[in-house]
A protein has these predicted regions:
Chain A
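Glycine-rich phosphate-binding loops of nucleotide-dependent enzymes
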Residues: 2-259
């Protein structure tokens, strides 16, 4: 079997006396879309933040391409090829689309110490990538605050894809989107996956998950209820699992690859 | 670092979005963060031109006086502006003006160090104290308002205490002679372009003293170094903020520190560096005042932090960070300087200075809020 791009083994995360994650294992293969489902407060965001270098896990091991990795900060995770689009903190509203797009990786020109941002190139690429995602901007200097919630998410997704992430983590990217933009994001996930990038797709919406997912993992109160492959589980079964797993016993047979 | 890649459009839109209104070039050119400050500056000059057009205010000599006062505000405002955009305040900057000047004077007079060494030590100390402020703020997560308020008292207290315990006075004089021939002190005091001004005077372009010891010399000898500092800092600040990667990080740090951190911006480093830079600006002002006046006084810089904050806010910066303009802040400083000196020329009751300033502050801030909403789409 191929080596997962990222593998998380028995991850625990405690915030003081709150146990947000109590032993979650999870992996992403190249070119797959692994959906992470769960109710509010299940620990999905906390889990992907440990993957993205925001939180250090209290316990557990993390492997990138089969080798143990420790991320001290989000920059480390980014340079390992893990890009994340956060649920609520994707972009900075007061700043322009172009500046947001390039944040942290600004293209520079000139001689040190007089290096400046290459605005011409930055603006052109930002406009182009945004229009690929179906969003037409008035100008690259347009502030992100003037965009709708969905358009803001799209800026962050376009950015992550452009910078050639190996793993793209999307925390509820479709929760604020309308029909057309959701279709766009799902189509983008599909394309990203075809390029061999592993996608971690967090959602509450089982239909969105079923549309693109290759594997499904359900989190509940900081624990995994199991991982199922595409075609081995129905939308109804997933829905029930998310709702608290009352019918877990009945579903156990369908969860072939239970961790 | 990574390979840029392009994803073909799932739903490609080639046509212009029909819901986007075209914005005229003119509208785009004038809707900018500095607009409020530009209007304010025009209003203030118009006001004084009517009231004091015939006085010395609009002679070269008068212009030099309000320019010098404005320059003091600019030097501080540039530091405060960048720090405020990064999302923090420093209320200890006024005390830092007094403190750095006093340290400079005491090292020279009481300890007998060479002037250039005292200047370097005072600047280094200011940077270090700025860093301590910054580290305390980012490590404790306390509002910078509280942390730097504490430093406002601590530094002012240390200034008075060190002066009294070393010299038994709160004013340390004798710096004029000490700094007279020092190579580094020349950067902080005196005037530049004196040759040009003398030449202009010889050709009758600017007036000369008719009598006395300085007969034949121009009434304005040159451009004070402080104005050179102000212009230099203004250009540097504006360039840093709007053209460089670090400037992008300053905006991001103040705009949304959490989002900035997640995307890989070293937020704590940016904040600490901005605290250091603001302290450095205060120290430059403190040292140049000492060189200029020939003495250090323990009460220098009193209330200067608030005045600088007012300049920056008039200039269009958002008090909560993430938005602002260095040029705007400098215009705010000019408004401040012109009003302060203008009321002196017009012989208006100086208490009216505050009334006038308060009104301008209010007007500019209301205008700025409106402009900012237009630009950023804040709801
Ligand atoms: N920094 C923190 N400090 C303390 N507790 C936290 C912190 N972050 C998360 N938690 C707790 O961990 C639990 C999981 O939160 P998390 O944000 O991961 O949920 P989620 O599955 O993403 O929910 P949602 O679907 O609403 O986004 C919650 O009970 C939350 O209160
Ligand atoms: Mg969440």
């Amino acid at each position: 079997m191929a080596v997962p791009i990222v593998e998380m083994i028995d991850i625990q995360k405690h915030f003081g006396h709150i146990i947000a994650l109590s032993g979650v294992s999870f992996s992403v293969m190249p070119g797959e879309c692994h959906c992470l489902l769960g109710d509010n407060g299940a620990g999905k965001s906390t889990f992907i933040k440990t993957m993205a270098g925001v939180h250090a896990p209290t316990h557990g091991e993390m492997k990138v391409n089969g080798e143990t990795a420790h991320f001290a900060n989000p920059r480390d995770a980014m340079s390992a090829g893990i890009a994340t689009v956060y649920q609520d903190l994707a972009v900075i509203p007061l700043m322009s689309v172009s500046r947001n797009f390039w944040m942290g990786r600004e293209p520079e020109r000139g001689v040190w110490p007089f290096r400046t941002i290459d605005f011409k190139m930055a603006d052109r690429v930002a406009m182009q990538e945004m229009s690929h995602m179906g969003i037409n901007l008035r100008e690259p200097e347009q502030a992100v605050g003037t965009l709708s919630g969905g358009e803001r998410q799209t800026v962050a997704i376009a950015r992550a894809v452009y910078f050639g992430a190996k793993v793209l983590i999307l925390d509820e990217p479709t929760s604020a989107l309308g029909v057309r933009q959701t279709a766009n994001v799902l189509a983008t996930i599909d394309q990203v996956r075809k390029k061999g990038i592993g996608v971690v797709f967090i959602t509450h919406n089982v239909r969105h998950a079923m549309a693109v997912g290759d594997r499904f993992t359900v989190l509940n109160r900081g624990k995994t209820l199991g991982t199922a492959d595409r075609g081995k589980i129905s939308a109804d079964e997933l829905q029930n699992l998310m709702a608290g797993g009352q019918e877990l016993a009945q579903l156990e047979s369908s969860l072939g690859g239970t961790v | 670092m990574t390979m840029p890649s392009t994803v073909a459009a799932p739903l490609m839109h080639t046509a212009r979005d029909e819901r986007i209104k075209r914005m005229s070039k003119f509208r785009r050119a004038i809707i900018r963060p500095e607009l409020g400050a530009i209007c304010g500056t025009v209003a203030v000059f118009a006001f004084f031109f009517v009231l004091a057009g015939g006085t010395a205010m609009f002679t070269l000599e008068g212009a030099m006086s309000w320019s010098t006062v404005s320059a003091q505000f600019v030097v501080l405002a540039v530091g405060v502006c960048l720090l405020m955009i990064a999302g923090e305040f420093d209320l200890s900057l006024g005390s830092m003006v007094g403190f750095s000047g006093m340290i400079f004077a005491l090292l020279t007079i009481a300890l007998g160090l060479p002037v250039w060494l005292s200047i370097l030590l005072a600047l280094t100390l200011a940077c270090a104290l700025g860093a301590i402020n910054g580290i305390l703020v980012v490590r404790t997560g306390l509002p910078s308002f509280i942390v730097t308020l504490a430093f406002m008292f601590i530094l002012r207290g240390l200034t008075i205490w060190s002066a009294i315990s070393l010299t038994r006075q709160t004013v340390v004089s004798g710096m004029g002679e000490a700094a007279a021939n020092d190579p580094l002190a020349r950067l902080f005091g005196g005037k530049v372009l004196t040759g040009l001004f003398q030449w202009l005077a010889n050709h009758g372009v600017i007036a000369t003293f008719a009598r006395g010891a300085r007969a034949g010399q121009p009434v304005v000898e040159g451009i004070p170094m402080l104005i050179v500092w102000a212009i230099g800092l203004l250009i540097f600040g504006q360039w840093l903020l709007t053209r460089t990667k670090f400037g992008n990080w300053i905006f991001a740090t103040g705009g949304d520190p959490q989002a900035a951190r997640y995307i890989g911006v070293p937020v704590t480093r940016v904040k600490i560096i901005m605290f250091m830079f603001a302290s450095l600006c205060a120290a430059v002002l403190g040292i140049s005042q000492v060189v200029e006046f020939g003495s250090a006084a323990a009460d220098r810089g009193l209330m200067k932090e608030f005045e600088a904050i007012i300049c920056v806010v008039i200039g269009g910066a958002l008090l909560t960070g993430g938005y602002g303009s260095v040029i705007g802040a400098a215009l705010g400083a000019v408004i401040f300087g012109v009003v302060q000196q203008g009321l002196f020329f017009t012989n208006v009751e100086s208490s009216l200075f505050r009334v006038f300033l308060g009104s301008i502050l209010l007007g500019a801030v209301i205008a700025n809020t409106y402009i900012r909403r237009l630009i950023t789409g804040e709801r």
